[in-house]
């Protein structure tokens, strides 16, 4: 079975922009060695929203950044499916952010490893074996 790593939105942004010091050093090797590196479609929305609100500096049009930061960068885009959305709704409400709940549900649906520095993710017992 191939290993998939799903990047939380901030990890994806840092990875693409070469800000490797922002996450644990061993993750870079795990990400590079994974058979599939992916992001949830909701991460595109989070990037565009953060950029639109001035919380994220991107020096090219955000649409170009998103396009360049997916397939050309070796990152697979995972869709939001009915199963993922229902699973996100049914998660215990530890994390109030619906975007993060959708990322958690995506990880669980795909059985993938999750790269995130969000401390709330570790409070989900069902994520225990999926966190990097």
Segment roles from a protein language model:
Residues 8-9, 47, 88, 107:
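Generic structural signal for small/hydrophobic residues in well-ordered secondary structure
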């Amino acid at each position: 079975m191939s290993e998939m790593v799903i990047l939380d939105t901030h990890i994806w942004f840092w990875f693409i922009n070469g800000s490797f010091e922002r996450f644990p050093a061993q993750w870079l090797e795990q990400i590079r060695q994974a058979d599939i590196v992916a992001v949830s479609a909701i991460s595109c929305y989070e990037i565009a929203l953060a950029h639109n609100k001035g919380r994220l500096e991107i020096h090219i049009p955000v649409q170009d950044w998103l396009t360049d930061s997916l397939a050309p960068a070796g990152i697979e885009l995972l869709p939001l499916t009915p199963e993922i959305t229902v699973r996100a709704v049914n998660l215990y409400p530890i994390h109030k952010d619906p975007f993060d709940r959708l990322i958690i549900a995506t990880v669980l649906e795909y059985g993938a490893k999750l790269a995130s520095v969000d401390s709330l993710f570790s409070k989900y017992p069902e994520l225990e074996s999926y966190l990097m």
